[in-house]
Amino acid sequence: MATDLKSYIKVWDDVVEEDFCQNIIAQFESDIPNHNRVDREQRPKFTEYNISERYEAKDPAWTQLQLDIQELFISYTERYIDQFQLGPDFPSRYCFEQYRIKKYATSSDQFKDHVDVQDYNSARRFLVGFVYLNTPHQGGETRFPKLDLDIKPVTGRMLMFPANWMYRHSGQPAIGGPKYLLGTYLQYL
C-alpha cells in the first residue's frame, strides 16, 4: 500500500508498441491546419492537437486511433485502481477529458511548474494520464520539483498521477529533437 506522495505517481513501460506511437506522430505531423500553438511565456509553450475533436468530426485518420487510445487509458486506469486498492474510494462514475497530443518542438518549448487543477473549470480533474510517444535525445522529463522526482520520457511509457496541488510538475525542454506526449485527464461526472 502506498505510504507517501511519490507512491501515487505510477509509471508503466511498453504499454504500446513503437509503431503505434510513430503512427500517431505521423498523423499529427500530417495535419498541420489543426495544430494549435500555445505560448503563454512557457506556462505552457508547445503545439497541441485535439484527437477527440478529429474523432468527433469523423476524421477517418483518427477514428480507430481514438478508440485504441481510449481502451489503453481505461485499461491502465483499472490497473492504477487495483494497484492502490482504490475500489471503494475511486469515483464510481468518471470520464476522460479530450485526448490531446502535445509537441515540445525546441529547447524553448516547455511547461513550467504548474498543477493541473487551477480553477472551477479544471476542478473536475482528479487523475493525469500521459503516454510518451518518443524518446527525446536529451531532456524532456516530467519533473515533480517538490517531490525531487524526474520521469524520463521513453517511447511507450505511461505516467499517471493525481491532478491536485500536491503534484506540482513541469515539462522540461527537450534537447536535440522534439518530445511528443499523448495526454488526458480523468474527470468526475
Name what the model sees in each region.
Residues 1-158, 166-189:
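Fe(II)/2-oxoglutarate oxygenase catalytic core
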